[in-house]
């Protein structure tokens, strides 16, 4: 099986490591190549254009892991491609024309947007509890942030971060309907090399059917903080609470707590779970490798994934939500992080925990 990685930067190398681990641990013969602006010391076959790579390498899977602003141009270059496309989130930026992408990808055999938190054991357990007990969502809130100040990687802004939380709320409660934004406040700044007025933070209200959602997401959170809180009612109108905590204290270390309160107000724990995976070779990659493994098995063995991929329709639906969020955000004058003559960027060889 041949896998082409378009963009072998930080994200692309994460995919490379994941696929190489899958090959070594499963025995599946995977052949990797990449497209980039310049050749790197990787030992992998290199192509300087997407068109040439598609013709010469003929990949079964194409991974799109270029920076946010290059997603749309690269996806359009896949017009006529008949293999499987695995795309880093978000699908495109708020400035791109979504309608032009449908035609470009109409012949692909499959598509998956990389929404890795769906592949957390904690997330999957909560989804099963909600479904099994027929809980009805009443409220949801999230805080989803990390520090991307002076990061060397270009970005379209906080829409690339908030997509995880917005997707999770809907994915956990699929029967509740489609998420609708009600209001958005935000802040723009020069935190990124991508410009002086990039949206770095949003605070939003939304509706998911009869449930109400509040959320905060930021690329200038000075610590990584990823939590989702949900309140439900069960068949007996009893209030149930659940909290998901992701990537704390380390990447892929996730926790779930589900509880209610008795008549006296005392907390009654219903379920508690935590995961701290430490499989060698998968540092920061445990959830991503699950997605990659399912893509490989779907293509190579025609094996249905354990859960449906976040397909192109889902990616477009989420992107329209992000576009509305970006355009509707009420913002004050931009904040300034750069006060000296030059910007000091985070080094490309920084540790994975800092970059994540």
Features from the language model and the residues they span:
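Rossmann-like dinucleotide-binding domain that binds NAD(P)(H)
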Residues: 149-229
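NAD(P)-dinucleotide binding in Rossmann-like oxidoreductases
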Residues: 213-291, 308
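Short beta->alpha connector loops
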Residues: 9-11, 67-70, 91-92, 117-119, ...
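A structural signal for well-ordered alpha-helical segments within the folded catalytic domains
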Residues: 9, 13, 72, 120-124, ...
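A contiguous active-site-proximal alpha/beta segment in oxidoreductase catalytic domains
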Residues: 69, 92-152
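C-terminal helix-rich "cap/oligomerization" subdomain common to oxidoreductases
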Residues: 61-66, 290-356
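N-terminal Rossmann-like dinucleotide-binding module
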Residues: 1-42, 56-57
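Beta-loop-alpha module in the N-terminal Rossmann-like domain of NAD(P)-dependent dehydrogenases
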Residues: 43-105
